[in-house]
């Protein structure tokens, strides 16, 4: 397909709606929320037409937001200037590993050197993009095995300042999840990886570890557990590279009874406030775990990300990309 025809196809399939459509509402439960989100803020739809949008990541060198459509095995770039363009295809299923679903990348992150690192569902690995390019992407495997066994389907990730990678590995990228015949590990782990020391299993107590983030002082690790029977955000102290003092930071089991959705992606604001997708939309929690409010797009929301200056929070909500202005 020629580039002109491809551009036309993308334009016709994915409608960019910047400034033309809003949806949902913002629920305010505490005055602290007014310090983060303007009272007149709305949820602005930027693009729609996806199957399951995920993994939003602001990339300064591109001055835009990368995100994935997991079932489409594709990653997109959205910028204020150009709108939406296809960025990576394939994004996460290249035939690298035995797989039961043709799913692409999920979580995205930049390492301390600015390289793009992807949790690749279909390839069952965490990989690095070799070159920043639109066509024919090439990936380098960082980690795909633990104890001689294939990982399940790495889901979300974050780096500390030293370049250590922390990631979660639930079985969501496998067709039958825990019952999938290709699943080799008997648990869903939280791992640390580095070039110097390789992979280390940090914790395997959570049934569905999903979104993961570090506090700004890198002393605490937050992990969302996307299990309908145990809908919690767990917190751990990070001590000498290990996770200790596991505790419940926020318990949503009661909230889950009346709201749709489970914990998925989460990000930590420079103020220490946590923005986490979960029951009802995007929950905003202060550093003590108090629920300040919820951004309610009216759709299942997978993940969220700030831009470089924290002027906007971007949401991947089911079939749409949206954003909300911050203070």
Regions found by a protein language model. Give the residues of each.
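Sequence-structural signature of mature extracellular/luminal beta-sheet repeat domains
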Residues: 20-327
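Bacterial Sec-dependent N-terminal signal peptides
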Residues: 1-21
């Amino acid at each position: 397909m020629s580039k002109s025809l491809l551009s036309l196809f993308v334009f016709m399939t994915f409608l960019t709606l910047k400034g033309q459509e809003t949806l949902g509402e913002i629920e305010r439960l505490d005055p602290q929320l007014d310090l983060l989100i303007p009272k007149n803020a709305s949820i602005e739809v930027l693009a729609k037409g996806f199957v399951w949008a995920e993994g939003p990541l602001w990339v300064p060198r591109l001055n835009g937001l990368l995100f994935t459509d997991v079932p489409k095995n594709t990653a997109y770039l959205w910028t204020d200037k150009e709108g939406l363009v296809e960025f990576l295809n394939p994004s996460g299923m290249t035939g690298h590993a035995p797989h039961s679903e043709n799913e692409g990348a999920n979580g995205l992150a930049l390492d301390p050197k600015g390289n793009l690192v992807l949790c690749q569902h279909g390839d069952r690995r965490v990989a690095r993009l070799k070159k920043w390019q639109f066509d024919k992407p090439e990936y380098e495997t960082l980690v795909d095995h633990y104890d001689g066994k294939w990982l399940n389907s790495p889901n979300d990730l974050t780096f500390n300042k030293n370049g250590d990678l922390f990631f979660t590995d639930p079985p969501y990228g496998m067709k039958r999840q825990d019952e999938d015949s290709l699943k080799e590990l008997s648990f869903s782990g939280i791992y640390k990886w580095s070039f110097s020391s390789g992979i280390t299993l940090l914790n395997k107590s959570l049934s569905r570890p999903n979104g993961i983030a570090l506090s700004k002082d890198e002393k605490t690790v937050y992990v969302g557990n996307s299990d309908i029977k145990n809908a919690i955000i767990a917190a751990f102290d990070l001590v000498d590279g290990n996770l200790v003092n596991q505790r419940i930071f926020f318990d949503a089991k009661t909230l889950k009874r009346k709201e749709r959705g489970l914990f998925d992606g989460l990000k930590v604001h420079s103020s220490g406030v946590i923005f986490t997708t979960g029951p009802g939309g995007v929950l905003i929690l202060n550093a003590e775990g108090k629920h300040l409010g919820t951004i309610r797009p009216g759709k299942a929301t997978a993940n969220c990300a700030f831009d470089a200056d924290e002027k906007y929070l971007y949401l991947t909500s089911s079939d749409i990309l949206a954003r909300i202005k911050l203070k």
